[in-house]
């Protein structure tokens, strides 16, 4: 018995199959790998590729186009190159390298491409930004006038930092550069400043320690850590600083304040040198490529204080540079010194003497200066730098002199007590009003009569005494940000009152 198929059934089956057919034709511009090795690939056939474009290799490995040659393009890889071989197909994405930005990144640890690496799930944010953007022009900027308090007495008094400034932290390894940066981040708690810590070429254990310190201080909730570790490919170490800046710019451009720390740009320059030599770019001084200055200047120029028309936001940058045996005249240190608005120079000799933070008063400078200080700090810290500089020169002279007159001995004794006042343990920033009161007490000779070993105890007990008995003085300085005549009289009277009850250890 023959099965008869009706014509309407045939048409129905055909329609169903047509509706179910969903195969898509994907059109993409492709090229092929000519050679690959050391994290760099040469690709033939991507005639329309853009500089900085993201390209896709087999196995979901991505790269970035850096060289545009006549017959090929040079790309750096953001992943392992072990499984990529000659002849592999490379696709254009037609996208410039970008990273996610927004509030969702606060409190997270991400890699140089914005992917989370803290094991706390995906980052959900609708916003993204290109990693390399043009710095704001002159007409869109506002002079740096608003202080960014670091909580470190020696910095806030002697080399003040303003919102929108670029202040270099420079010194040999193990002199406390990272500690200053982390202290500054911790001190932004409650000040509505979003912080970004970019770790470039650091050991994973070091980055984990910084993250733990931030978490313990309650600072991680307003901080994003961007980590390109020593084990990561050189392209990620090069890119991390630009990615972090793009994330921070989101807050600056929405009228808020951000702080970014680059720890450190020496390793970024070394990663860029490695990439440039592998891409066969001509080497220059110390084998760095000719555009290594531009690599850093275009990064640091993005830190700025915007005008009120642009929302009045700010991005403050604290780049870190590591020197070799205190040589600040090397290529990368001189480059970054010339780009930034001042530097905080840390000396190994001071560090080993127990002066911490080991800030060299003579070599450290802020080109913004008093504009980034509140009036009260200007009033008390005006003569401090001069006194410390005179002490350092007198100390050097005293090392060779056998007999000193009484005035010189007094100057040396006073200088040593001022140094004690400026000493500070790590991860313990001090409120600006407390800094002002302590520097005021030292400037008015209230600590001169006590042994050096008593200065820290004097500071602690004196601040506690004022908080308990004269909290109105601290409140007035905090609110008015200046020391009026009546406040000065009240503070002097309170210090005299404390002087009567303080017990030095030698009595």
Curated annotation (Swiss-Prot):
Top-level taxon in the UniProt lineage: Bacteria
Binding-site positions, ATP: 171-178
GO CC annotation: plasma membrane; proton-transporting ATP synthase complex
Compartment(s) of residence: Cell inner membrane
EC id: 7.1.2.2
The entry's keywords: ATP synthesis, ATP-binding, Cell inner membrane, Cell membrane, CF(1), Hydrogen ion transport, Ion transport, Membrane, Nucleotide-binding, Translocase, Transport
Major site of localization recorded for this protein: membrane
Record bears the keyword ATP-binding: yes
Reaction equation(s) it catalyzes: ATP + H2O + 4 H(+)(in) = ADP + phosphate + 5 H(+)(out)
Pfam families per record: ATP-synt_ab, ATP-synt_ab_C, ATP-synt_ab_N
Molecular-function GO terms, alphabetical: ADP binding; ATP binding; proton-transporting ATP synthase activity, rotational mechanism
Membrane-protein topology: Peripheral membrane protein
InterPro entries assigned to the protein according to its UniProt record, in alphabetical order: ATP_synth_asu-like_sf, ATP_synth_asu_C, ATP_synth_asu_C_sf, ATP_synth_F1_a_nt-bd_dom, ATP_synth_F1_asu, ATPase_F1/V1/A1_a/bsu_N, ATPase_F1/V1/A1_a/bsu_N_sf, ATPase_F1/V1/A1_a/bsu_nucl-bd
Key word Translocase present: yes
Site (Required for activity): 364
Disulfide bonds: none
Biological function: Produces ATP from ADP in the presence of a proton gradient across the membrane. The alpha chain is a regulatory subunit.
Protein family membership: Belongs to the ATPase alpha/beta chains family.
Subunit relationships: F-type ATPases have 2 components, CF(1) - the catalytic core - and CF(0) - the membrane proton channel. CF(1) has five subunits: alpha(3), beta(3), gamma(1), delta(1), epsilon(1). CF(0) has three main subunits: a(1), b(2) and c(9-12). The alpha and beta chains form an alternating ring which encloses part of the gamma chain. CF(1) is attached to CF(0) by a central stalk formed by the gamma and epsilon chains, while a peripheral stalk is formed by the delta and b chains.
Protein name: ATP synthase subunit alpha
Species in which this protein is naturally found: Bdellovibrio bacteriovorus (strain ATCC 15356 / DSM 50701 / NCIMB 9529 / HD100)
